[in-house]
């Protein structure tokens, strides 16, 4: 079960950049297999706000995650992801605006849906070190 959780969590980070480049009406379809509310709605709002000011995402965070617990349909993940090849990009120039850090601590919760699929429901960037 932990393997399924980690697989979904890992793919979640790879679909954010394609979702940021997609039309607003396609974003939910790209993200929904890997994210659920409240994180899904938060992501959609954030991507729309970024697009409104000419920003998108580039790259993908590389998880170094472990599942810390699975209780019923809820799983907790602790991550020290490498975000050094990801960040915000100017949609006009194609140039990076921000660059992530190589050791980014993240706590996430995944929920298993009625279809049996695990989806990220919350993401917390702790601001600590890892």
Segments predicted by a language model, with ranges:
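Core segments of small alpha/beta cavity-forming domains
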Residues: 1-56
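Short low-complexity stretches enriched in small and charged residues
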Residues: 26-39, 63-66, 74-78, 119-121
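Solvent-exposed loop/turn segments at secondary-structure junctions
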Residues: 39, 83-85, 127
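Short, surface-exposed, polar/charged, turn-prone segments marking secondary-structure boundaries
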Residues: 40, 60-62, 70, 103-108
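Surface-exposed, charged secondary-structure patches
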Residues: 52-93
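Short beta-strand edge/turn micro-motifs at domain boundaries
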Residues: 76, 96-130
């Amino acid at each position: 079960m932990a393997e399924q959780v980690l697989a979904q969590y890992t793919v979640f980070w790879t679909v954010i950049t394609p979702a940021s480049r997609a039309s607003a009406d396609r974003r939910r379809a790209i993200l929904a297999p890997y994210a659920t509310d409240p994180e899904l709605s938060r992501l959609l709002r954030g991507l729309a706000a970024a697009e409104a000011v000419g920003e998108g995402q580039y790259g993908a965070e590389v998880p170094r995650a472990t599942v810390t617990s699975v209780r019923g349909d809820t799983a907790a993940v602790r991550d020290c992801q490498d975000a050094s090849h990801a960040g915000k990009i100017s949609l006009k120039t194609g140039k990076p605006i921000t660059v992530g850090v190589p050791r980014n601590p993240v706590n996430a919760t995944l929920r298993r849906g009625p279809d049996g699929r695990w989806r990220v429901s919350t993401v917390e960037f702790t601001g600590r070190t890892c």
